[in-house]
């Protein structure tokens, strides 16, 4: 059936035709766009949806999320800065969680940030023991790169004084006894093997909530950037889509350890294989994998014709990622490789120029500046602050930027990401490196066309053009027409997937 969305301020993100008033859709694809008069002339047997003057944009693309972890966080004990401000409050939250959890069953808690706690330190096993002695507890850091376990959980995981850290991992120990304090960094492989997975029914319920949350924010496609994705995770995503719990199309990054094990796509493109994910950890001034091993990993993916996505935050890691990609391209040039650096937290102007010259995409998180800006001002070395999430430098160097939330690290709120890319303002109002600000059009590109481009999907989504998927978000106003610090307050009035209103569920706007 044909549908026409009319009386809209259509912001197409297509340079050849940036604006329109109406869009016609059939069989999930855009068939026409133009003035109301021109498109409504095609209205025979069409359903009409009156957009009432709102801004109709391409559906927003979250180019870096951890979807299963985000879903799990929705059914975990909330220890985020919005929920707790001290270790005592973490203990209270865990006690509440334990009150309706059978003894002996694992308790999962997420989102703590030691810099937002009154004590300004990580909780330790003994803090958790005092609150919940009869349940194993895994308390996951906001970053996803650290966990604190209580004594029962450490015992079940087989972690003790004789345990050796894996390469790139770190286990904090009591300086006197050598006993683990419970804080483990970059040791997910060990923990994931020890901690029982969420059962299928719980996961399905959580993913349905996560999917609805994303749709309510105007997100119509996601890229799951989890470094441990493999065949099991692929099958999980496939099942969740088939059973109707996950309504969004998903691009699944392939963890390096699973290189070559995932199919290209399934379910008519609703599930796709993305780039090969390689994560660089940065602990104690060292990076892991080291530069030689990293270069070999990038080469193994590149020589197979694959795209890589390298997690690199600090400047040393970013530099190593650039060198590895540069070397792979020297050995085997490839014009449209679209290799990616995920995050790119600190990057000098010279390094930004190399990134631009090599055609590397940077997929970053503007919302981090909002949620952590005040912490960055306190903790980031002064000489690095001008180069913190340097979106302006990267674009001036000819680079391309895409945006993701990195949820559950921060909530998936793309309008806040767009706002923060423009304002560079933290939650308490401090502005970080204003010379790195973008204009609204550039910030929108990060969340639409260039986010799709970063996964080789700009032929399908990211702009409103005939032939592309009819994925839209209807906003209450044009983001460029409101004060920049009010962009996040715009209402998402409608989210459309393949021509069908996906959010709100019962919304039907017609004349």
What are these language model-derived features?
Residues 298-309, 316-339, 343-344, 349-353, ...:
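His/Asp/Glu-enriched, well-ordered alpha-helical/loop segment
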Residues 30, 38, 54, 114, ...:
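Short, glycine-/Ser/Thr-/acidic-enriched flexible segments
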